[in-house]
Amino acid sequence: MKKAGILNRHLAGALAELGHGHGVLVCDAGMPIPVGPRVVDLAFRAGVPSFAEVLDGLLDELVVEGATAAREVREANPGATALLQTRFPALELVPHEELKSLSANARLIVRTGEARPYANVLLRCGVFF
């Protein structure tokens, strides 16, 4: 049995398949999920697991070279804004509708139980060398 890191077998397997440039959308429970990308739905109930918990767990496992979020997060969700700006100083902000369009090209979507608005970020995978 695995003793550390991400224990969810579906998520761990999906992460192992990612390569340079692939997109990973980490989203709240309300984000529309497009048809096409692989989805790992971790939502259990409202707020569980949180966006922050899932994002930090993923950042422990992934090399990220870029991140994009909806600009609406700045006014609608100060907590998520602070979290994203701390984790990604070069965070790119786009209109929410554009983020939804970009998510259709993600390789993986990880849905959380987050129940605060605009707690979504599209990560672009980097390489460790």
Swiss-Prot record:
Pathway: Carbohydrate metabolism; D-ribose degradation; D-ribose 5-phosphate from beta-D-ribopyranose: step 1/2. It is an enzyme of class 5 (isomerase). It catalyses: beta-D-ribopyranose = beta-D-ribofuranose. Keywords: Carbohydrate metabolism, Cytoplasm, Isomerase. The active site is at H20. Coiled coil: none annotated. It comes from the Bacteria. GO terms for cellular component: cytosol. Its EC number is 5.4.99.62. Substrate binds at D28, H96, Y118, A119, N120. Its main location: cytoplasm. InterPro entries: D-ribose_pyranase, RbsD-like_sf, RbsD_FucU. NCBIfam families: PRK11797.1. Catalyzes the interconversion of beta-pyran and beta-furan forms of D-ribose. Homodecamer. This is D-ribose pyranase. The gene is rbsD.
